[in-house]
């Protein structure tokens, strides 16, 4: 797929097989079950080679995305090591992971994090976060950690984008969902594209929500369609709020 799309690649060979994740859809109850495999054991020389290759190809001004879970054998501070490389190269580092890898990666320094409410709760050391608590807890996190932008995913309700100066609530329209596979990744991809095009953070977060929402309108592992993305982005741009202080109502 990458070759067909003329996307340059740098592959780091490993001894094990690439992992597979399986999604099963119950068409009767409209429920989807996902089975995420842990993946092969990654040897020390393999993950170290990945860091070496990354350091060799990054240049100032790049946008770097690290996403997904770590395979067995990889240290939980792997994304923290990536963060140090990104800082040395002066690139925008976007991290989208969970658990201990998220905690260690976020504390080392990132440009943007895209947690959901549960992941944000983990980052902030609390059990749960309600909508009413979201703004104050997220702003406290930004104040105490080396992170410039938080985009908190709210699923079908959209997202909240926070910086030290502002809070933006991005509404998502109600659509006919066929599958949520790849919605989060599509959201990140949309934000990266907007950043690469020089768009503002507000435009970035709206376009990300548009891509994530559009991905739910396609079946199985199909990607979002550009026509859907553009139509959704127009709607979102007309129905979102930007302010210095915004109240999020339940």
Model segments located where?
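Conserved N-terminal subdomain of the carbohydrate kinase-like
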Residues: 1-62, 230-250
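Conserved phosphate-binding/catalytic region of the ribokinase-like
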Residues: 84, 103, 131-250
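Conserved beta-alpha-beta core of the PfkB/ribokinase-like small-molecule kinase fold
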Residues: 63-134
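Structural motif
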Residues: 62-63, 149
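Short hydrophobic/aromatic-enriched beta-strand-loop microsegments
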Residues: 6-12, 111-121, 168-174
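Amphipathic, non-transmembrane alpha-helical secondary structure
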Residues: 48-55, 59, 80, 103, ...
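Short, small-residue-enriched loops and turns at beta-alpha junctions
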Residues: 40-43, 70-74, 101-103, 158-159, ...
């Amino acid at each position: 797929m990458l070759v067909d799309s003329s996307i340059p690649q740098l592959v780091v060979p490993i001894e094990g097989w690439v992992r597979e994740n399986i999604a099963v859809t119950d068409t009767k109850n409209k429920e989807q079950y996902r089975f995420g495999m842990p993946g092969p054991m990654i040897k020390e020389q393999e993950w170290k080679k990945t860091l070496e290759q990354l350091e060799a190809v990054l240049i100032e001004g790049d946008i770097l995305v690290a996403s997904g879970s770590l395979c067995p054998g990889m240290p939980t501070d792997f994304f923290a090591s990536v963060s140090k490389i990104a800082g040395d190269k002066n690139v925008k580092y976007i991290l989208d992971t969970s658990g201990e890898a998220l905690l260690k990666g976020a504390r080392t320094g990132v440009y943007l994090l895209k947690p959901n409410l549960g992941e944000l709760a983990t980052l902030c050391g609390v059990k749960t976060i309600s909508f009413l608590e979201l703004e104050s807890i997220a702003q406290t996190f930004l104040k105490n950690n080396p992170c410039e932008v938080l985009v908190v995913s709210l699923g079908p309700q959209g997202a909240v984008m926070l910086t030290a100066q502002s809070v933006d609530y991005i509404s998502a329209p109600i659509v006919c969902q066929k599958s949520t596979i790849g919605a989060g990744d599509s959201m990140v991809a949309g934000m990266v594209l907007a950043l690469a095009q020089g768009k503002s953070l507000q435009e970035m977060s709206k376009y990300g929500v548009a891509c994530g929402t559009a991905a739910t309108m396609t079946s199985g592992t199909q990607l979002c369609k550009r026509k859907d993305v553009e139509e959704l982005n127009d709607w979102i741009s007309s129905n979102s709020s930007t302010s210095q202080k915004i109240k999020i109502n339940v």
